[in-house]
A protein has these predicted regions:
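Short glycine/serine/threonine-rich phosphate/pyrophosphate-binding segments
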Residues: 62-64, 130-135, 159-160, 179-188
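Short glycine-rich or small-residue beta-strand-to-loop segments that form or flank ligand, phosphate
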Residues: 53-54, 120-126, 175-177
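Glycine-rich oxoanion-binding loops at beta->alpha junctions
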Residues: 106-110, 147-171
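Glycine-rich phosphate/diphosphate-binding loop of Rossmann-like nucleotide-binding domains
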Residues: 118-160
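Glycine-rich phosphate-binding loop
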Residues: 164-200
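Short, structured coil segments at secondary-structure junctions
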Residues: 94-96, 192-193
Length: 200
């Protein structure tokens, strides 16, 4: 159950369109489901505002499918799967309607959330080889309802490439700087902006 659904449920009780016993039954649903190999936290969205995400690394295709299926059955509108390999994507995609991006290894099932309108997240890379990690961050942020601006190959070896995007950097509410070969990108960005900078 998501927080919005819980608020709607309580409003129904307050308005008299649902009785207290019906509401109690809905709220009593197990907060987690034990599949033997995984315990799915169905109430995470209600507590934290964001539903549980499936970390695909190390899980079998069948395990990923069963977790995603259980989430959908309990009413989770969007299921995000990170670090999903192609074999798992094929397996899950044959059983559920899956969108898969091979570069970022992100799988997505369900309805994309409406953008929250709370500003933009900038994802910047030092070089082209950093793009897969950056895309994982960008697609995850988008799946969680954020607007994302991508600034790729803007490393400090050619600082003019970064400075050419100063307006976008200044408008960001948070910046994710992905730079595997050079550690300076996050520091340089941090010296230019007043928002949080996450270094990867």
């Amino acid at each position: 159950m998501e927080q919005k659904e819980m608020i709607d449920l309580l409003r129904q009780v307050a308005s008299g369109t649902m009785d207290v016993e019906q509401a109690a039954l809905k709220l009593k649903e197990e907060p987690f489901e034990d599949l033997g190999f995984a315990k799915i936290d169905h109430h995470r969205a209600m507590r934290q505002g964001v539903a549980e995400v499936i970390y695909g690394e190390g899980k079998t295709p069948e395990q990923i499918f069963r977790i995603a299926e259980a989430m959908k059955e309990k009413g989770q509108k969007a299921v995000l799967i990170t670090r999903m390999n192609k074999e798992s994507a094929i397996y899950v995609g044959e059983r559920l309607e899956l969108q898969y991006d091979e570069a970022s290894r992100i799988g997505f099932i369900g309805e994309a959330p409406i953008k929250d309108g709370d500003g933009k997240i900038v994802v910047a890379t030092g070089g082209t080889s950093d793009i897969p990690v950056a895309e994982e961050a960008a697609r995850t942020a988008e799946t969680l309802g954020n607007e994302v601006v991508r600034l790729y190959d803007v490393g400090v070896a050619g600082v003019h490439r970064l400075l050419g995007h100063l307006d976008e950097l200044m408008e960001a509410r948070v910046i994710i700087a992905v730079a595997g070969m050079e550690g300076a990108l996050a520091s340089v960005i941090g010296g230019l902006v007043d928002c949080p900078v996450i270094a990867v």
